[in-house]
């Protein structure tokens, strides 16, 4: 409001009462220089503001003064039940719809409604809509029975004009059949300037002309040669505006040429050409020199006047096939068709009518362009028959589409002709949705319950998902509707009537402004409101006390026959009547009527004090106090002496019996002790301490004590809390070797407890012996105590996976997991708890072999202990189980938790567990169920194993034996369990034997001496590779092997199997020869039983690398399936450790004939080439004969391995690297032996010939690093004549 000088009282109005909504805003501006006009105050009767003088102009309130129950509405008073109906606007005078001052929606005969009564209503009997006699039209906000004459009727409303797609017909708006009629004027020619004026036209008064200029554009020139408007180019698709055109009163002139102007489908709905005006040749259809290929005038039915001229259209087909007389109404005009495309060319290009068209021709290709159909017609399409889904046969030649509510076929056009309904079936009719009085039950409309109002969702007489939308009256139970009633039906017993607020929200919103029956209080049987006072409770369910209903009478009341609670006598504690002699118990004293105080049925009176008749108060502990004629002392004095005498006699008897029993027990125990002492003295076992054997096997591990001068310390490797770790060399006293070691030195000045823990670590390390556990070599007991262990050149596994992340594949990762699990399983078997397992405490010996170390926190459990409880000290929180952190309890299962974290570190390539979480917060996270996330490369199979390791219940975690088996199984198919990009191209960093030797040399470079460099494993477990002397028998092999140490692993970490019969392990090759010689000489064992022949040798193989005895005499250890089958790595169990057991031995052995071949494989099970032969020496048959003798090659020494002379070159004999070649023959078998076993008798070979002499003359410097399985100097195989092949192929 702006600058209203004469306006009074406007500032007194409360505008919040009037305007509503978020955009409501009141603004008052007064900019005059003179002060505002002084107005008279409002009348004293006004609450706040007024619109003028007098009480009649006071502002009335119906919003700001309402109760909260009337929220979002108005009211006629401040009380909760004085809310206006929701259909009211601006206030009301009562709660009904007829009490509104104004209506929010519609006003219908004095009542405010949501909408006007509909003009149609549903008849459930006929399943159809019928006119509603009470229907009204909406005229503005008023419901009227008839619309004013100047307005139209549309969908129950009075409108000024029809909406789109409807037309006025007899005062009503009806849907148009297709486009709604629109008449437009014709033009001289169509161009880009006027094309849009034809939009939605159905009739053109005049003609249509389309020329070349229509598409190419042109400059308009007036008759006085002045220039008009320039019209741009137009694409033929702009002619789509003519798709609604049905009639042209003049002619249709087409002379346009454009590459995209192929047909006249833009006029596809054109039905009539009037021909009121004609063009050249008196034509009403004139098509000359166009680029048309077909017409596309599929709806053209009549040309009333004029001829038809189709001329000079070089691409036009179909014109000759059309029966033009059927279209022309006038017979006076001819049809001119000339110089169009040759009909034979059209046929050649397939531009002919569809087979469903009749002989009258067509407008273009397809069944929709026929003038008439050969069989049936459906709309504009010609069909073979009317059997397709969704159509039916209307007459002999016509098919029609089923009603849109039909799902599939039908027999007629209406909704009751459908065989199946698309949405729902209401009686015989298909409907898009069920009417309001019915619900959809699996496609069938069924009637709602009779009490439902506004529709339903199911048959139940209730408001809910399977019942009514609303009802006139509902029965409530705990604020939830449980049934509906008719509007005039009364509430059942136990319920009371209540009115629901019109602004109700929640489950009662469908019942707003309606009546409900609420359940009475549980104590009331009939009521008028909620409560259990007689004001609202008409009848009690159980008992009534005073003015209230009760579930039961109180303790000091009793119920009469009418269930009324009546008070007991004042001295009673519970009663069954009102008198003093009807009490269950008394508050003070009883007075027995018949003096029988012990009977339960004895009657008594209750009294506050004893009466003069019964003056004495008796307090009996077994009963209530009562009044008596006699005093209590007389009764007690009579009984007291007898009671005391009985107690004394019983106590004396008990003491005598107890003393006798103790005496005899002591005598027997003394006699038994003397008997034991005498027996021990007689047997010589007199000892003061009794024996308590545990059955535990003795620990026979050896602890080697060395001197300080045997140690050579080098650079420092790491720091610890109690000492430092140095790399160094150990030179054992009296031996000519140097061993690279790691030396852990205790700090000076450490306490006695630290030294004890240092020795405890030494004890545990010396007690373990496993290929995946770092073993103690020796202890130096100087002032600074030293622990000597094997040197792990590649550092810890944590740094290794971080450094070589891009080179580590899935197989290596799973092998490491398996090895760690096997090492921990060994500790579990020996009752050792590690307590500090982590990736930093796993050392890498080779890329294929890891070892667990750092036993500083490890504890050995006694035979009767299942757990260790730490007293204090630091703990690696993020690696520990929850019970370790909270209770300091350590078991093997807590090591399993740490194993899961260690595996997580490895599979995340050195990730930090709980990296951004302080250690003190880790226990809380674990209790809440949080665990380390799944590594990116890890499948759910591996992650589930980690989750099992992190179970809060320790007993639910797997054992290390189970973990080792699981990871061993996964390592045989690594790509299935770890998804690493480029996995098959990854190779671990090379760490060959030469690298290790070089490391040892560098380490000992400062300590030069004559000692030989030896690895710790070789020093502890040496192996012999001495050649076999001639004539040596099986019984002569019992001597000890020489001291020359041999590295028992291939450079890639694969060990040499101890029972291999190939020269790749010289010791076992010698043993095979000895077995064969002994068996051949004695004739005890067939050469076809290599598994059994090994049992006759007396040579005991030394332990394999890492401490396991390798080799087996059983056939199962040699083969994984058929012994005559070439073994594939998938058929065998693939080893994943750094030592060879039976599995590894089996999976590397191939079989040719009866001979096992131990072939060197790399980490991916590919055959490794031997480094023995020089690159310029062929390994195949010399067909040219210009190869040089191998004896001329210089003999080489490589890494300390023996070197044998190369193969002899004998004239006519050629070295051959294919062992099967000499086995194929057609002149009978050479010998029952396979390759690798000499054809002549072994004794002859060993005693004379080239073999024996060469063996005696060889030195260790001449021995080779690797030998092939067809070493000639051992077998003299080249001296055997080559036989022709038995078959024309080579068997592999």
From Swiss-Prot:
It is a single-pass type I membrane protein. Residues 1022-1066, 1253-1292 are annotated as: Disordered. Disulfide bonds: none annotated. Keywords: ATP-binding, Developmental protein, Glycoprotein, Kinase, Membrane, Nucleotide-binding, Phosphoprotein, Receptor, Transferase, Transmembrane, Transmembrane helix, Tyrosine-protein kinase. Disruption phenotype: Reduced adult size and ovary size, and prolonged developmental time. The active site is at residue 836. It catalyses: L-tyrosyl-[protein] + ATP = O-phospho-L-tyrosyl-[protein] + ADP + H(+). Belongs to the protein kinase superfamily. Tyr protein kinase family. EGF receptor subfamily. This is Epidermal growth factor receptor.
């Amino acid at each position: 409001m702006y600058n209203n000088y004469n306006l009074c009282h406007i500032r007194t109005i409360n505008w919040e009462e009037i305007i509503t909504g978020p955009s409501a805003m009141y603004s008052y501006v007064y900019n005059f220089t003179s002060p505002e006009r002084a107005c008279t105050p409002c009348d004293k009767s006004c609450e706040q503001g007024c619109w003028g003088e007098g009480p009649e102009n006071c502002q009335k309130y119906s919003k700001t003064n309402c109760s909260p129950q009337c929220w979002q509405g108005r009211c006629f008073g401040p009380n909760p039940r004085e809310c206006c109906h929701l259909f009211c606007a601006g206030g009301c005078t009562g709660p009904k719809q007829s009490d509104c001052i104004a209506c929010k929606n519609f006003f219908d005969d004095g009542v405010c409604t949501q909408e006007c009564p509909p003009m149609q209503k549903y008849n459930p009997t006929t399943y159809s809509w019928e006119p509603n006699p009470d229907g009204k039209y909406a005229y503005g906000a008023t419901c009227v029975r008839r619309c004013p004459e100047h307005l139209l009727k549309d969908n129950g409303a009075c409108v000024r004009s029809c909406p789109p797609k409807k037309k006025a017909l007899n005062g009503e708006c009806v849907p148009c059949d297709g486009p709604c009629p629109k008449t437009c004027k014709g033009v001289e020619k169509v161009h880009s300037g006027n094309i849009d004026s034809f939009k939605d036209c159905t009739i053109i008064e005049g003609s249509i002309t389309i020329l070349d200029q229509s598409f190419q554009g042109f400059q308009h020139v007036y008759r006085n040669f002045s220039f008009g408007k320039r019209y741009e180019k137009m694409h033929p698709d702009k002619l789509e505006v003519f798709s609604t055109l049905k009639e042209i009163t003049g002619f249709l002139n087409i002379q346009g040429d454009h590459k995209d102007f192929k047909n006249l489908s833009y006029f596809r709905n054109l039905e009539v050409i009037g021909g009121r005006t004609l063009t050249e040749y008196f034509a009403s259809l004139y098509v000359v020199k166009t680029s048309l290929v077909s017409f596309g005038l599929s709806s053209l039915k009549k040309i009333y006047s004029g001829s038809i001229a189709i001329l000079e259209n070089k691409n036009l087909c179909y014109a000759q096939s059309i029966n033009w007389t059927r279209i022309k109404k006038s017979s006076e005009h001819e049809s001119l068709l000339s110089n169009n495309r040759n009909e034979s060319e059209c046929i050649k290009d397939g531009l002919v009518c569809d087979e469903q068209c009749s002989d009258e021709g067509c407008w273009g290709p397809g069944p929709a362009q026929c003038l008439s159909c050969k069989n049936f017609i459906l709309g504009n399409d010609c069909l073979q028959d009317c059997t397709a889904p969704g159509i039916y046969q209307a007459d002999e030649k016509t098919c029609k589409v089923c009603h849109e509510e039909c799902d599939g076929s039908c027999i007629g056009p209406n909704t009751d002709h459908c065989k199946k309904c698309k949405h729902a079936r209401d009686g015989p009719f298909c409907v898009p949705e069920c009417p309001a009085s019915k619900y959809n039950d699996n496609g069938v409309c069924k009637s709602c319950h009779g009490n439902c109002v506004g529709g339903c969702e199911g048959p139940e007489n209730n408001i809910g998902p399977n019942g009514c939308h609303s009802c006139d009256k509902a029965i409530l139970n705990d604020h939830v509707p449980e049934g509906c009633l008719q509007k005039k039906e009364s509430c059942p017993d136990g319920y009371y009537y209540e009115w629901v607020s019109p602004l109700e929200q929640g489950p009662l919103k469908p019942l707003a402004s309606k009546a409900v029956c609420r359940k009475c209080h549980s104590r009331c049987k009939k009521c008028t409101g909620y409560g259990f006072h007689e004001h609202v409770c008409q009848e009690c369910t159980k008992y009534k006390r005073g003015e209230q209903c009760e579930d039961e009478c109180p303790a000091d009341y009793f119920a009469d026959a009418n269930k009324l609670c009546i008070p007991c006598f004042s001295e009673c504690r519970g009663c069954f009547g009102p008198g003093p002699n009807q009490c269950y118990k008394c508050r003070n004293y009883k007075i027995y009527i018949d003096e029988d105080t012990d009977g339960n049925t004895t009657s008594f009176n209750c009294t506050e004090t004893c009466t003069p008749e019964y003056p004495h108060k008796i307090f009996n502990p077994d009963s209530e106090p009562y009044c008596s004629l006699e005093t209590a002392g007389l009764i007690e004095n009579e009984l007291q002496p007898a009671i005391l005498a009985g107690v004394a006699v019983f106590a004396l008897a008990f003491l005598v019996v107890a003393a006798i029993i103790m005496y005899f027990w002591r005598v027997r125990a003394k006699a038994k002790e003397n008997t034991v002492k005498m027996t021990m003295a007689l047997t010589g076992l007199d000892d003061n301490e009794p024996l308590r054997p545990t059955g535990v096997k003795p620990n026979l591990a050896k602890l080697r004590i060395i001197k300080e001068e045997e140690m050579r310390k080098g650079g420092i490797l790491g720091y610890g809390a109690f000492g430092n770790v140095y790399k160094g060399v150990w030179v054992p006293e009296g031996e000519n070797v140097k061993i690279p070691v790691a030396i852990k030195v205790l700090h000076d000045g450490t306490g006695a407890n630290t030294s004890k823990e240092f020795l405890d670590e030494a004890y545990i390390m010396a007690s373990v012996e496993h290929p995946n556990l770092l073993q103690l070599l020796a202890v130096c007991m100087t002032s600074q105590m030293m622990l000597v262990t094997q040197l792990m050149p590649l550092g810890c596994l944590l740094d290794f996976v971080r450094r070589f992340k891009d080179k580590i594949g899935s197989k290596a990762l799973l092998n490491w997991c398996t090895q760690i699990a096997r090492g921990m399983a060994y500790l579990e078997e020996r009752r050792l708890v590690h307590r500090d397992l982590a990736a930093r405490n796993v050392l890498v010996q080779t890329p294929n072999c890891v070892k667990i170390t750092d036993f500083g926190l490890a504890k050995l459990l006694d035979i009767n202990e299942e757990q260790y409880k730490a007293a204090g000290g630091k703990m690696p929180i993020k690696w520990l189980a929850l019970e370790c952190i909270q209770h300091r309890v350590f078991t093997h299962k807590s090591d399993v938790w740490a194993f899961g974290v260690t595996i997580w570190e490895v599979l995340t390539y050195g990730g930090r567990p709980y990296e951004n979480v302080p250690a003190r917060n880790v226990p809380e996270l674990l209790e809440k169920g949080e665990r380390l996330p799944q590594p990116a490369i890890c499948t759910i199979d591996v992650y589930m194993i980690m989750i099992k390791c992190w179970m809060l219940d320790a007993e639910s975690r797997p054992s290390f034996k189970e973990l080792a088996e699981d990871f061993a199984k996964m390592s045989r198919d690594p790509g299935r369990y770890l998804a690493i990009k480029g996995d098959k191209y990854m190779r671990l960093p090379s760490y060959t034997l030469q690298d290790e030797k070089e490391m040892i040399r560098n380490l000992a470079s400062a300590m030069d001496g004559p000692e030989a460099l030896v690895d710790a494993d070789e020093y502890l477990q040496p192996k012999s590779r001495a050649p076999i002397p001639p004539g040596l028998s099986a019984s002569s092999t019992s001597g000890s092997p020489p001291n020359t140490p041999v590295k028992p692993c291939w450079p890639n970490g694969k060990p040499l199997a101890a029972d291999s019969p190939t020269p790749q392990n010289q010791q076992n090759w010698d043993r095979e020869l000895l077995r064969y010689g002994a068996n051949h000489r004695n004739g005890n064992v067939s050469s076809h039983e290599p598994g059994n022949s090994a049992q006759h040798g007396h040579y005991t193989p030394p332990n394999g690398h890492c401490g396991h005895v390798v080799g087996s005499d059983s056939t199962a250890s040699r083969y994984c399936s058929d012994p005559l089958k070439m073994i594939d790595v998938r058929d065998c169990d693939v080893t994943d450790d750094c030592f060879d057991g039976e599995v590894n031995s089996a999976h590397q052995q191939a079989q040719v004939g009866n001979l096992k071949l131990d072939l060197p494989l790399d980490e991916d099970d590919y055959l490794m080439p031997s480094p023995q032969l020089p690159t310029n020496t062929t390994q195949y048959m010399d067909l040219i004969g210009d190869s040089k003798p191998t004896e001329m090659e210089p003999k080489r020494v490589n890494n300390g391995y023996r070197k044998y002379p190369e193969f002899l070159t004998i004239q006519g004999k050629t070295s051959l690297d294919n062992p099967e070649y000499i086995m194929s023959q057609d002149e009978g078998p050479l010998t029952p032996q396979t390759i690798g076993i000499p054809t002549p008798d072994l004794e002859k070979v060993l005693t004379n010939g080239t073999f024996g002499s060469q063996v005696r003359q060889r030195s260790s410097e001449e021995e080779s690093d690797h030998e092939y399985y067809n070493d000639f100097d051992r077998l003299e195989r080249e001296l055997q004549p080559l036989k022709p092949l038995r078959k024309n192929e080579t068997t592999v």
